[in-house]
């Protein structure tokens, strides 16, 4: 089963099937601030060392998992429905929603389409900055 493909022009790995057998992770940051972020926005952020200067919760075994993570929720008040840009943590039915993850150097982009709404979220740690955008 194919889960994604390389885009040589953009230098990205594109995951278009979120039902992976295990977490596929991207490492963001090159200096003091760093993050491990997987294909469903799970992961954690740390400063210098993940064991002592973590900013988000650290799981020493099994990291990264789908939770904790970096999630953006979108809610439709009229329909009383909501979803997340990444497949987790809401995990909408894949027959009704489309999710895609693009791991690049040094960023990750999450894209979704649900109920007529297309959304995207870009995660990056700019070189020389101690911030996750």
Residue ranges of each PLM-predicted region?
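Anionic coordination/interaction segments
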Residues: 1-133
């Amino acid at each position: 089963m194919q889960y994604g493909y390389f885009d040589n022009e953009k230098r990205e790995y594109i995951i278009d099937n979120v039902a992976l057998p295990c977490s596929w992770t991207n490492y963001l940051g090159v200096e003091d601030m760093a993050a491990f972020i997987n294909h469903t926005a799970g992961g954690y952020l740390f400063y210098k060392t993940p064991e002592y200067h973590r900013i988000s919760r650290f799981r020493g075994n099994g990291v990264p998992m789908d939770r904790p993570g970096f999630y953006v929720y979108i809610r439709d008040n009229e329909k009383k429905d909501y979803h997340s840009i990444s497949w987790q943590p809401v995990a909408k039915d894949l027959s009704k929603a489309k999710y895609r993850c693009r791991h690049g150097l040094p960023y990750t982009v999450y894209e979704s389409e649900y109920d007529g709404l297309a959304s995207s979220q870009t995660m990056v740690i700019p070189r020389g900055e101690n911030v996750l955008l």
